[in-house]
C-alpha cells in the first residue's frame, strides 16, 4: 500500500525527463569506457588488467547491490534513493577525473556502480507508482531508450568524446546531466511501501550475494590464468558454490529476504527476467567486435564505434515501435520477434572469416538487426516484469529485473572476453572472435526458448 501523498500526483514529462537523464548516467556515460581502454592505459600509466577491472567493476557492483537498493527504495522512499544515486554518480565522476591515480579510477567506478544500483530500481518503481496504463507504457519506453538506447550509443559516444574533447569530458558531461536530473526530479512527492517499513534489511543475504558474485567474476576473468587445477581456482569455485547454496537456504527462511523467490512463482516475471539477463549478456558482442576490428582490421576506436551506428539508430527508433506492438499484440510476440531478429544480427556480425569489405557490410547490417531486435524486445519485457509485480514489492521486483540487466552485461562481457582470448591464443584472432560471437548468439537462442516456454500470451498480473 502506497503513501496517500502519491494519490494526488500524476507523472508528467518533467519527471520523466529527469528519470531518463538519471538512467543514462550509467548506460551511456559510465558504460562508454568500453571503447577507450588504450587511452585510459596511457592517461593513468597503468596496465590493461587494471583498466579492465575499472571498466567492468561498475556493472558488477551495480548488479550486486541493485536488489538491496530496490528493497531500500521500497522501505525508505524511491525519490530519495534516486537522488542518492544521482549524487553518488557525481561523486564517482569527480574521483575519476581529478587525478591520474589508478586507485581513484577504480574507486570512482565502484561508486558509479552503487549509483546505478540505486537509480535503476527506484526509477522503475516511480514509473509504476505515478504512471498508469498507456502512460506507463510510454514512460517505460523512454526509460528503455535511456537504458537500451544508452548502451547502444555508448561505444560510439565514448570514442567520439575521447577523440574530440578528451576522455574526461565523458564524466564532466555526466556531472552536468546529473545536476539537471536532480533539478527536474525535485518536488516530486515521495513514494514508498508501508508494508515492509518495519522489517530488518537482509544484510546476511547481501554479504553472501557479494561473495558469490565476486568469486564467480574472478573465476571467469582470471580462470585461464589461474588454471583449473590450481588451488586458488578450486578454492574460489568452492566459495562460489558454497555461498550460493547457503544464500538459497537462508533466503527461503528469511522473513524479509534480499531476493524474494516468491516473485518467481509468476512465469511471466521469470521469463522476462531470465531473458533480460541473457539478452544483456550479448553486450559481449560490442567488446569482441570492437576489439576484433581494431586488432584484426586496424581500425581506430572511433571507426570501430562508427560500425555500430545502425545499432544505436535502430534501437532508439524501435523502442517506441515495441511499445505499440505491446499494446496491439501483448508481451510475448514482440519479445519473441525481437529476440529472433537479434539472433540473425548476431550471426551476421560473427562472419569474421569474410574479406574485409564484405565483413564490414555484414557488420553494419548485423548491428542494424541487433538494434532492431533489442528495440522491439525492451519495452514489452520491462512491462511484463513490472506489471507482474505486486505494488508493495515493486521495488524489489524491479531491483531483481535490473540486477539481471547489470549482471547479464557484466558476465556476458567477461565470458565473451575470456572465450575470445583463449580461442585466439589457441588458433587466431579471426576464429577467436567468431567463437566468442557464437557464444552470444547461443545466449540469444536460449533467451528465445525461455520466452517461448514461460511468457504466456495473456499475462496474469497477480502473483
UniProtKB/Swiss-Prot annotation:
PROSITE patterns: MFS (PS50850). One of its GO terms (cellular component) is plasma membrane. GO terms for biological process: response to antibiotic. InterPro entries: MFS, MFS_dom, MFS_trans_sf. The keyword Protein transport does not apply. The keyword Transport applies. It is found in: Cell membrane. The chain crosses the membrane at residues 17-37, 53-73, 86-106, 107-127, 142-162, 165-185, 201-221, 230-250, 273-293, 299-319, 334-354, 357-377, 403-423, 435-455. Induction: Transcription is highly induced in abscesses. Up-regulated by MgrA. Down-regulated during stationary-phase. One of its GO terms (molecular function) is transmembrane transporter activity. Keywords: Antibiotic resistance, Cell membrane, Membrane, Transmembrane, Transmembrane helix, Transport, Virulence. It comes from the Bacteria. Belongs to the major facilitator superfamily. TCR/Tet family. Multidrug efflux pump that acts independently of NorA and is one of the factors that confers resistance against diverse quinolones and chemical compounds. Can facilitate bacterial survival in vivo when overexpressed in an abscess and may contribute to the relative resistance of staphylococcal abscesses to antimicrobial therapy. PANTHER family: MAJOR FACILITATOR SUPERFAMILY MULTIDRUG TRANSPORTER MFSC (PTHR42718:SF9). This is Quinolone resistance protein NorB.
